[in-house]
Amino acid sequence: MQVSNSMSLNDEEDDIEFINYIPLLASPINSSTCSTSIHDKCPFKQHISENGQNFGSAISSNISQRNFKTLRASHLSQYRDCNRENNTEDKNVISTGIAVNEKYQSVLKLKEKAPQISSAAKRKSFIKERGMLAKCFLARLEDEVFQGRLTSSLEKKEIGIVWSKSFSTTAGRANLKRNNKDAPLGKKTYAYIELSDKVIVTKERLYNTLAHEVCHLACWIIDNEMQNPHGACFKAWGKRIMNNMPYIEITSKHNYDIDFKYKWLCINEKCNKLYGRHSKSINPQKQVCRLCKSQIKQICPKIKQPNAFQIFLKENSKRLRKLHPHITHKELMKKLSDEYHRTKDAKQNVSKSVSLISSSDL
């Protein structure tokens, strides 16, 4: 199946069309899911160099083919998520002297003036719109790459999206279900993609993971290839998607930096193994580093040290409870508080008297 390229860049006016054509998609980091080595990237990433000449020759003559790759990256960078706080790369692209139109420069100025948004606000905004973003992206893949063949044999004529909280490190998983496993694909076939609520936290990860999982579904539904999950069939579909959408990158397995809520570090400087969990499931008092058997310490979130009053409560609550077994918890806390303040005042008076004696001796 050949993918037709609907872009036509023949003159200077089409340069503006090229900028407008780039959708509001973030540039990829590295994508995908499943069970292969992290560094096992697909060899078809050369699609940029293969098709660079077709794009470069169509753009205005004042932009050389050598600079096309940089121009493409600069255009895409302007449409990244607003959570990119550092736009020095975009400024460097402008300073290289590449010919860019006024519309592009206005986009850069608006980006520089945009207010800074907190990470919590970004996450909340992404959660609100991620369902619609995923649905629109899958519809575009079905229309431009698969030409309607992917969902035509499904009962609901669409691919479902399920957000999972149980995926702690896996970005996504494609699923194809039939009521009768021996029956061919038909009306009783359901397809859906599970996405990690903890890993998929940006648009770029969403689009790259969806593209990866859709390649699996295409192998199963269109080519009936069920054996090799990341074989020639998977790579062929991945190449077609990336040729049609250069801002998408499909690899065998993702290497996203997952933002774990809890982190522990091995105290052995030669090891320094970092452990991350979404819940407080590691107890440094009972568990050690699995590599060097050294102790580990919690580094995130930082453990707050107890203040003087908390230490006093821990040391004296049992004693006062034995002295007053029938009082309520509120009354017990009142007695502890009064005793703490008396002890604190006594210590301060002693320190003042000591300082006065020392000053008189001088």
Swiss-Prot record:
SUPFAM superfamilies: HMG-box (SSF47095). GO terms for molecular function: DNA binding. Its main location: nucleus. Residues 306-348 bind DNA. Keywords: Cytoplasm, Cytoskeleton, DNA-binding, Nucleus. Residues 135-299 form the SprT-like domain. One of its GO terms (cellular component) is spindle. Pfam families: HMG_box (PF00505), SprT-like (PF10263). GO terms for biological process: protein-DNA covalent cross-linking repair. It is found in: Nucleus; Cytoplasm, Cytoskeleton, Spindle. Coiled coil: none annotated. PANTHER family: GERM CELL NUCLEAR ACIDIC PROTEIN, TRANSCRIPTIONAL REGULATOR. This is HMG box-containing protein C19G7.04. It comes from Schizosaccharomyces pombe (strain 972 / ATCC 24843) (Fission yeast).
